[in-house]
Amino acid sequence: MIKPFRIDIPQADLDDLNDRLARTRWPNEVADAGWDYGFPLARLKELAEYWRAGYDWRAHEAELNELPHFTTEIDGQNIHFVHVRSSKPDALALILTHGWPGSFLEFLDVVEPLSQDFHLVIPSIPGYGFSGPTHERGWDLVRIARAWAELMRRLGYERYGAQGGDFGSGISTTLGAVAPERVVGVHVNYLPSRPDPDADVELSETDEARLDKVRRLMANRPPYQALQAATPQTIGYALTDSPVGQLAWIAERFAQWTDPRSPVSDDRMLTDISLYWLTATAASSGRLHHDTSRGAPPCPVPLGVAVFPHDITQSVRPLAERLYDIRHWSELERGGHFAAMEVPELLAADIRDFFLTLLK
């Protein structure tokens, strides 16, 4: 059964958030530390005070409620999703999947341009936001992809495309693997490339530089990834009890992974962080890093790739072509890891170009 859903956070939860923010116990900071030890204290205090006294959750809640929200139970888990129908009845449907530390609202600014040509289904990953928390182990890429296939079946879509970045990329390519007869193609804006000494391919200087960046990242695994992959429950206690802890944990990702030429606004970032806080899904969302250790199966359907210059890493096409049926490859001029929020017009145009060309 599919049920309409409306976001309506109890006022008591908002009052509790403001009270906790007002009573934050701050650590000291080394003079002139900058980013050497992590998120700078002055900037975090600024964000926390704005979250408490300036940011208006109700205004953003109303904006989110302008979209048609629904919930349904799949494989024992409540699944939240947005479903926007195009004015074109025979339009192709696209299922758009966010990543961590994002949420369904990543796609807020691509809904209008994409819905001109496509029906849109935008789910929250199990364990995230209004699809959370999860209550059992095993929600990995394959299980989520199978849930997406069932969701699209329930909505009556026999053939559809998939799109995503971060975890949304892995979920989308996995959906192409588990339902290749249904998925016409997959578009991603994040496709990790790993060094492969056995690959007999010619690499450009740009390719080599991108692989060097990957090697450095692999040698110095990001702390957030190590913690959430190993002990998401442990870090979850701190993030679920301290809004400033949750703020720092996610705001650091936005600061480091976005293009300085196209920053995400504080309001949009705080709405994303508020979704994690108000649904108490820090731990359950982090479990996805733990449960996806086995990676994604091969994806046999056509793939489109959009590469953004300020993403965590950039894809290497000769290596990607050994693994995927690449039909479309774009090197965009601006944007980072949160492309749908940073440069929605560029991402929407690239998604449209890939799928409309594929359908010709």
PLM region descriptions:
Residues 114-130:
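Conserved alpha/beta-hydrolase
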Residues 142-161:
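Conserved acidic catalytic loop of the alpha/beta-hydrolase fold
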Residues 13-85, 268, 277-293:
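Non-catalytic accessory segments flanking enzyme active sites
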Residues 100-112:
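The serine-hydrolase catalytic nucleophile loop
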Residues 113-117, 157-210:
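Conserved hydrolase catalytic core segment
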Residues 57-59, 105, 125-139, 173, ...:
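Glycine-rich "HGGG/HGxG" loop immediately N-terminal to the catalytic nucleophile
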Residues 228-360:
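C-terminal subdomain of alpha/beta-hydrolase-fold enzymes, centered on the catalytic histidine
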Residues 90-99:
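Short beta-strand element of the alpha/beta-hydrolase
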